[in-house]
Amino acid sequence: MDTLSNTIDIDIQHPEEWRLSLRIDEKCVSFTAHSDVERESFLFRKVELDGGANDFLRPLENCIYDNPFFLLDFKQVKVALHSMRYIIIPSDMAADTELAERAFVTMYGAIGGNLIIDQMKGCGAAIVFEAANGVLPFLNRTFNNPPVRHHLSAICEYFAKKCEATDADRQYVYLHDNRADVTMFRNGRFAFANSFECHSAADTVFFALDAWNEYELDALNDELQIAGDKAAREEVVPMLKKYITYVMPAIFPAAAMKIGQDAMKAPLDLILMSLCE
């Protein structure tokens, strides 16, 4: 499965049978698509954006309009936005929009774009995050008001599901795109999530251990489960094992096999988005 920089070679005859999941950041649009009818239809690609942090909307518009594939009449479109301007607050607090907005402003001083409140199932928490100015209206116009979530939500919900029947203290580390997404669970309950930019394996180890120590997990008895980029995992795991006894791979969602063998090669968060109805 090649990760191409465009969508020219993708030929879909019946888009009304297909589901599209997009993860959008300042550098690229990563996406998966699969058919509810065709076997082994799953595909994963990335399309680079010609722009940067200070000019995000126009490159995104160009990317979508330059790739007619994105404008097909899909059965379903879902979007995850990468945003580092976010807070995580209790679900009941997030249910009050005014209160959620005040909490965000307390953290960041002002709202510079569109604020989105993303309730996470099974976590007892919500991510309140900012979409860059103009991005949310563009997505709503182009994809007919798709669900737009934070890039951390899918993995938080998935790992929360894995912990719900336990009283485990556990850390999950998901490696992708030079990032480490770290989630923490205490007594089987969601406690913390953050996304860290990592320029080296040492960065990943530092952020993982910092969260581990902050939440006082036991290095001899508690688990650290790791997912994501294979090469990054192979470099990081031996380093983590110097400090934590139980470092093991996170369980891959078995349901992903139903949408195609290539699903195993796609990023975990996009797979999880693809599996959710």
Kindly give the residue locations of the regions a language model identified.
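Hydrophobic/aromatic-enriched cytosolic interaction surfaces used to assemble or bind macromolecules
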Residues: M1-E277
